[in-house]
Amino acid sequence: MGFLTSNTAAPLQPRRSPTTMAAGAFYLPKESKKRPLGEDAHFIFPEGQTIGVADGVGAWSFHGVDAGKYSRMLMSKAEASARSQAGGGVNPMKALTDAYAGTNVLGSSTACILTLTDDGVISAVNVGDSGFAIVRAGSVEYKSPVQQREFNYPFQLGRGIWSDRPAVAARIKVEVRPGDVIVMATDGLFDNVKDELVAELVGGGADAPGKVAERLAKEALKIAKSKDVETPIALEARKAGIEYSGGKYDDITVIVAYIEAAADQSGTIAVNLGT
């Protein structure tokens, strides 16, 4: 069962930035009668040019805790913080810190929050193995680094003694330009789909971002259920000395955001050609 968010590719408020971001998302939770919402969460805040994903750590289920409640509250609080900042530009680190401070349920979660600044730069914070990639001209130009202590043990926000605080977050700034495509996702995508296939499935930008997110998520699910496909997680497992083949069945959240030339107040497209 898939949960398609409302596509937010509608025109945004005029801004001084040379670029703007239009985003859509698709979520495929693992099939579970006990936890039908899964353990992933996300938000899209178009007016603030900000998106975020979180992945609740499933090991909490062994203690009777639904980590999805943690990730959902974390993203809800992050969006609320972003909205409170929107007038002066969103600081993703503040959004993450505010979200952590306001999340008061048991559990832990990875998290990634990203905003497009007024100078056309992606500013992001990332904790754990969720993250984002920038697709440019048919290939992955940049991918956020994974934070983990060992194979399949990512950094994670939480209150437990084994959990992390927002200060551990990687702080990332990357210049983007019109035509770039941001793919933000939980590890349900990146564990299963190679970078080359991500870029191929993104295509040339003809489809709405929510449709591209759906395509990526469904491909990840297909690979996740395979036992003989060479996958990123299988490669990483073997590097760690663990025999592993095929994909990893998991919740899958994908947000796709198109970077576009922004229009000024008169409707004129503002394009910085550089030098």
Segments from the language model and where they lie:
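PP2C/PPM-type serine/threonine phosphatase catalytic domain
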Residues: 1-275
